[in-house]
Amino acid sequence: MKKILLSAAALLATAAALAQTSTATHTVRVLTPEAAQKAVNAAMAECRRQGFQVAVAVVDRSGVTQALLRDRFAGAHTPTVAADKAWTAVSFRTSTTDLARATQAGQPSSGLRSVPRFTGVGGGLNFEAGGSIVGGIGVSGAPSGDADDSCAKAGIAALRDDLEL
């Protein structure tokens, strides 16, 4: 009788543990609109400090634009390119600078350049919190991808204390 009770207890404990870990939903972290705007403002301030007129976009973890700002003399194309850089970084889970190298002609991943919205030039980075990507930032309009990257990094740094990087 003891064996049956112990077996039943073990079976119930196993079933309870499985029931707790098997769910139909998943909880994720997302940037608030206030955090997205804070990052956009910081990135733009850094670009202005360097003398660049740019557009800055922040997208959520799904690539949907949360905040977008174009400086008054930034080119008409820069808001779209900034949003596409942020989208590319989030979608491919890596910086656009790294993707630029990995997708050069002759590389196995060069076909990615034909994906709509793919932007393989520096200036797109990811926000991470607790080991998960929670959004991306894209900057367009500085004279190089490296300069765009430096401004995007300022946007990420502005949220460093708010995110568990």
Predicted feature residues:
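Positively charged n-region of N-terminal signal peptides that target proteins for export
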Residues: 1-4
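Short, linear, compositionally biased motifs with a strong N-terminal bias
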Residues: 10-11
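Flexible, solvent-exposed loop/hinge segments and secondary-structure transition points
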Residues: 20-165
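N-terminal signal peptide c-region/cleavage motif recognized by signal peptidases
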Residues: 14-16
